[in-house]
């Protein structure tokens, strides 16, 4: 299995590598690399360890780099003699993916794309991926058995790009009906995904029933303890079955039976009952729809804790935890209940240490695995909960939200944080590490480094690692290149969380990407060090004669440049708005003209990047078997990266720095706002903000419905295009 990974990713020369699987022993996965007589030999305790050991060594000598953006492979004909030490990962499990990834990135993936991703996982030492595809096939069979008609099911499943939130109980029937062909295709796809993961010895995390039921089921069972939950982010309410109701265990057991019969028996089953929802505490569940989930960073409503005694709350939570565990255990006694720990950090108003302990206390320590995913956003949750009350847990970072793609990460933080974690005597049953991004295809250096750390790389110099990384990625390195990357690391790769993504209840990675508002004077702009990023860009451009033939050098240059330039556009937007608001029409016109010119250049520059609007829509339409389905998938795909849905704050949450989005979505929206501002400046009047917002909402919905075709337009000379763009955005 490991050899197959290496052949697919590194080419035919990988056939000469000698791979030897050996017993693991009592510890965690390990590998060891040696070379003699010109041949590379890798021994390891698992297929994943073999693949990762080979890749890690080849990257360290500059022979291979495999990333989402592309690969550079130059395996030598013969290897210098070498004998490495045995490398043992400090983590029993290396986890990967987020339930949201299946909406923000993978809804349109076919087997060829999934095969590449599973290969990437193996190369990076990952052995516990979340495997969420294909579950709607089982849910459909389950609800049919429990009497829900096909007509009602058609008004239950949400569109492909929104499926994760329907599965987690946040929404229901959004962008319904879901084509049956999509359900059938995902069933066949999951068969292949799980077969490959299991062949590699991975331990996929599979879905389980967490309590959410179709509205039609709730209406058909008025005597059941089914609670109407709160409306999440402006969507209509959903329905949750109390685990104390006898129906809960029947449904939960039957789901796992059907799932195992369909896809094979698993060990790890994910059930998140309260993803950005609060547990009903009142005996009759009447508080369920009144509670407001609170995320202070997102500026949403604060939690209103139920007016009940702590003892009643803790008893209720303990009952929930026990029932959720038992529903899985009865179906599969060997199973481990997996849950995300995001809720414990995101809503600390409700999830006090006492509440967390109550929820977990009735579950055997070895039968629950908590994915503590948000330590780059909500640090220290595990400490507040006494390491999750002695349960098994995996430490990790989300990093990416919504698949949005500003350039950021905090490499030194990941190194220092994991070093401190492993040295902490209070970590109890820490068993793993993982990256849990909501979306992929951005900042690949972050994930490359995270999984290096997962195999014990905390003691190595970050600068030395970056030197090896860039040599493998571009073909060679130099002091000048290392100096440029030192600046890049300080300027943008020392940013742990992208704070501008939420600003005054508006989502969007940059100001340009947010729905326009007239009061933007206090927008603080990009974190990090933009002047130092600009210096790094000059250094990279100076290296163009030496590196311009390296595709991944050109890719990275464009990525860093568009990030810097978009931040400059944000500042120019503020200048234009300020000028119009003070009545200086000429200055406003000049500032917005600079914005328009820069955005058009940005749109052209990013046309050669991996993912753009035309590729996203093309992948969506490629899933269709009929013209009607193609149009449906296209609308679904466009909605997610723009309006999202509901009447809350989710618009632009999945904003993208893509060709097509710059020129055809973000710029026209701001043009509407600037027209209103300019007219008010000319007339001496004021802008009706409410009317402007309504006009923008109508324009956004029209854009989603519009069938304008998009095609890829890559720049003929990316280096020259970067030079022109920087000259444009830095002009005064």
What is the predicted function of each stretch?
Residues 91-110, 121:
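Active-site-adjacent substrate/metal-binding segments within catalytic domains
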